[in-house]
Amino acid sequence: MASGIRAEDEAAFEAFLALSREIGGDILKTQGAGGNTSFKRDGVMWVKASGTWLAHAGEQDIMVPVEVAPLVAALRARDPSAEKATDFVVTALNASGLRPSIETSFHAVLPQTVVAHYHCVNAIALSVLAGREQILAERMAALPDLAWATVPYRRPGTPLAYEIDRVAANRPDVLILYNHGIIVAGETVEEVRTRIACVTAALSVDERATVSGNAAHLQTLIEGAPFHVAEDAGSHKTALHPANIAVATGGSLYPDHVIFLGTEIGVLGAGESVTAYAQTRGARGLDMPKMLLV
């Protein structure tokens, strides 16, 4: 339990940590250290700290307390201190010396008590499509009781917070961030959990059918080369359909695309060995891509 949480709020805060852990444990919502959640009480907001994982909520100290009002004022005044939000940490309650997430400022401008931001794979997939406005409107029409809006892509940090601040006063229940992810907000943990379930169902996308990969053959191909066969079966689908390959190699679509895979995904040429591919890259002074499609 975080220090500074009133006894009467302990159950709600524990529920918040449990929700954070659930979101962090779902690969279709959170990948690695991505995403963040927040809980506001008495002018203080507990938000996921930089570099921590939602999946560790409740097991490790990952929430850092910040003062909401001065942070919001700084953001609206275009004060550079709003970017990292470290000046607004409640030091007396920050026993682990954690630093706020770079996205702390947008959590602060949203008035709801509980806010969950995560990198929903399906929300991202729909938000990068041509005609995304109509596609999303048709999907969200299934949830007429939820107020929702879209937010254009902006760099995480104050640029994104400025855009969210434009719509925050309308108290949106759901914000779909183009090329980034989703935000779900509410007054209670259970309200947010229910909304997440509803939005997840509404935005669900069927996977494109592909043939099966051959891990044994891939293992033979990479012998002597600086690559390993992906352990996740789903990852192989990227290479098993022409449309998937076109999307994967067509450029970066969202921040985590670059964080996890870099700016380039390699494709093995017809008749080319993996070893020859690696040697050619090395001879040209090029870094090895983090993913090679065969």
List each model region and its residues:
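Glycine-rich flexible loops
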Residues: 1-294
